[in-house]
Amino acid sequence: MLKFRLILTVLTVLLITVNGQFGVNIENKSSTSSSKSAASKPSGNFAIPTALRRPNPFLQRLPSAAADQEALFQSKTAQAQPQPSAQSTNKPSFQNGQQSGGNQPMYPNQPDPYQTGSYQGPYNSMNSNNNNPPTMAGPVPADRISYQPAPKNTVQSGYQQPMPGQQSMQVPNNGPSLPAGPSYDLHNQYPPQQN
C-alpha cells in the first residue's frame, strides 16, 4: 500500500512538471505564430487570388444551357401553335345527324340523338337497346320511367293510416288509398315498431 502511494505521488509530480513545460512552450509558440500571421494577413476581407481559383464547369455551362433551353422552348411553341386554315371553325355542323367540327360526341359512330329525334330518355344500363349518351334532355316518355317515388304515408300526401281490419279512409284531395291490414311507412322504408 505504501509503495502504491509513493508511485502515485511520483507520477503526479512528473505529470505536473511536464504539463507546465509544454504549456509554456505552447504559449510561446502560439504568441510568435499569431504575431507572424497578423503581419502576413492583409487588412480587410481576405480574398482568394484569381489565379488560385479553380474554374467551376457548371457555372461556365450555364449561359449555353440557358440558350439551348430557350431555343428548345421556341421550337416547341412554334410546333404547338395551330396552323391557320380556311375551313377551321369552332362551331359544330350537323349533316344527316352526324356532328362534324367543334366538340365531337361521346359516340361518334352513332347519329346525334338530339338532332335526329331518337333520344329516348336517360341512360339505363339494364336496357341493352339504349345506347344513348348518359345525359338528360327534355321530358322522359312515360314508358321509359323506371322509378316512381313512393308517396309519403302522411295526411298531407292524400291518405291516412288505416286502422287494423278497416279499409283506408279517403281524404278530400283524392290521394291514393292503402289496402287494409298492416302497412309500412313508405317514406322511411322501415316496418312499424312492434310493442
UniProtKB/Swiss-Prot annotation:
Residues 29-43, 74-104 have a biased composition (Low complexity). GO terms for cellular component: extracellular region. It is found in: Secreted. Keywords: Glycoprotein, Secreted, Signal. Its main location: secreted. Glycans are attached at N28. Residues 1-20 form the signal peptide. Residues 26-195 are annotated as: Disordered. Residues 112-123, 151-176 have a biased composition (Polar residues). Component of the acid-soluble organic matrix of calcified layers of the shell (at protein level). The keyword Nucleus does not apply. This is Uncharacterized shell protein 22. It comes from Lottia gigantea. The lineage of its organism: Eukaryota, Metazoa, Spiralia, Lophotrochozoa, Mollusca.
